[in-house]
Amino acid sequence: MSDPQEEPRGVHNPRVVDLITDDPATGEVVLVMLEARPWESEPLQLRQLEAKFNAYLEYVLGGHMGKQYPDYADRPVRIQLDCAENPRSEDRAFFTAMSNFAAAEQIRLVVQVMQTPD
């Protein structure tokens, strides 16, 4: 994956991990995918999300995260999609498939709606 300071962040760019942090409450390493666009704003949006998700899986399962961040190497991983709004109900099967695939690799997928400042 590319240096995040050289590449734009967001679901539209699968070449960069948008954010890596840790969650002390769960012990998980959290890889965040950022989606600031509303759903259906881009015809290829779900394909872009799929490409980003697959890139994150490769980053973790291919050992790249552990090489780049040795302290995270043996920690549980959560991939978190921070999005502008809840996914559409008609896309539920897509998100369920992603979650099931991640779970089969011992990775948790979480979808979280970003809070906007009032």
Q: Which role fits each region the language model picked out?
A:
Residues R78-D118:
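Helix-rich interaction surfaces within compact, conserved domain-sized segments
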